[in-house]
Amino acid sequence: MLGLPLVRDNTTACAMPRILLAEDDDSLRNFLARALERAGYEVTACADGDEAAAQLDQDWDLLLTDIVMPGLDGIEVARLAAARHPGLRIMFITGFAAVALAAGESAPAGAKVLSKPIHLREIVSEVERMMAA
């Protein structure tokens, strides 16, 4: 036996909240992912709705999605996500919220809509508020 002291880790493992991000604008997607990661979230970033829908078999704490994207739009992704994960927090960030939601597509109950342009700090604050609720 070595003469090394026994070290006990009394901290509890706490998983970072997981965010599924769907945004077709490359630069905005990268900025959002970095800002949310710096704020302590685990982020999986997808370039379109189809890519995001393919990730829905995993557990997520929040879906943050653009509405107008190639493939499945954000509302369709949100509906699929809400059906698979009841209680999932959903937030839309879009420049076309009024147009997209007025076209007869209703967002899942409890979803929040943020309009572009929006400052990264404001998005992080809104995500923090939604995660705390």
Each model region followed by its residue ranges:
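Charged docking surfaces used in two-component/phosphorelay signaling
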Residues: 30-38
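Acidic, metal-coordinating helix/loop segments flanking the phosphotransfer/catalytic sites
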Residues: 45-62
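Active-site residues of response regulator receiver
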Residues: 66
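Conserved acidic carboxylate
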Residues: 23
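C-terminal output helix
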Residues: 118-128
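Receiver (REC) domain active-site loop signature in two-component systems and cognate sites
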Residues: 69-70
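Acidic catalytic/metal-coordinating carboxylates
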Residues: 48, 73-77
